[in-house]
């Protein structure tokens, strides 16, 4: 008989929900940088583990911060 493999990928925890963050402020650059790649792109949910609701809030906050000049649109090489 074939043995079944145990274990697998562990589900990622939503950082925003785990830390009870109600409002994602576009001025909180340190928080937003956690969800941006080295190139300045917004990381997807499957990488960060955020819920769909919090991912939408994050996206809006990151885009606002970019327009205000707090975050770069692209990273410098």
Curated annotation (Swiss-Prot):
Domain of life: Bacteria
SUPFAM superfamilies: Ribosomal protein S18
UniProt signal peptide: none
Pfam families given in the database record: Ribosomal_S18
Subunit structure: Part of the 30S ribosomal subunit. Forms a tight heterodimer with protein bS6.
HAMAP family, per database record: Ribosomal_bS18 (MF_00270)
Protein name: Small ribosomal subunit protein bS18
Lineage per the UniProt record: Bacteria, Bacillati, Bacillota, Bacilli, Lactobacillales
């Amino acid at each position: 008989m074939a043995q079944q493999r145990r274990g697998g990928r562990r589900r990622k925890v939503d950082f925003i929900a785990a830390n009870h963050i109600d409002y994602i402020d576009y001025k909180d650059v340190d928080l937003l940088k956690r969800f941006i790649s080295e190139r300045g792109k917004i990381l997807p949910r499957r990488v960060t583990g955020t819920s769909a609701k919090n991912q939408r809030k994050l996206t809006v906050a990151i885009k606002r911060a970019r327009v205000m000049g707090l975050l770069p649109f692209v990273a410098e090489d």
